[in-house]
């Protein structure tokens, strides 16, 4: 075999490896969350954010609570007095999901974002995974807020 042919085969192999990895990368998507959740409770006041989903024994499968802070920064949630296992997605000011965590009922440990977040969406534990909603996807937050008025 000629050296030129071997170089061609080597480049072709690298190209196919590259295509394989690129095709397996998660493509982020823009999500209209109202297509997934029939009820989204919006909490923007301090007292409402502080209480969150405390004391509720159950929440519907297609229910979410959207927390809105007056500033973008590192935000924290906890599960004190919360009966239902939850997942939380921290969302930046542009609507991009930056982190997703599963939270344990009654835990007093804070679950904090490591990046600046403006919003958080709490849902039943495992819901994001079930819906194939991932870090990097974007939620149309402004659309939710416009429909809430």
Language model segments and positions:
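Compact, glycine-rich, soluble single-domain proteins
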Residues: 28-149
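Sec-dependent signal peptide recognition
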Residues: 7-18
């Amino acid at each position: 075999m000629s050296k030129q042919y071997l170089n061609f085969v080597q480049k072709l192999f690298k190209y196919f490896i590259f295509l394989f990895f690129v095709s397996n990368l998660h493509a982020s998507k823009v999500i209209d969350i109202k297509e997934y959740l029939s009820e989204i409770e919006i909490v923007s006041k301090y007292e409402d954010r502080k209480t969150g989903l405390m004391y509720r024994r159950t929440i519907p499968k297609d229910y979410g609570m959207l927390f809105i802070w007056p500033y973008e920064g590192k935000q924290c949630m906890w599960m004190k007095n919360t009966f239902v296992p939850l997942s939380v997605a921290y969302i930046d000011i542009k609507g991009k999901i930056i982190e997703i965590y599963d939270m344990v009922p009654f835990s007093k440990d804070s679950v904090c974002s490591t990046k600046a977040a403006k919003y958080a969406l709490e849902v039943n534990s495992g819901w994001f995974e079930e819906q194939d909603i991932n870090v990097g996807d974007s939620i149309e937050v402004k659309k939710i807020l416009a429909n809430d008025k």
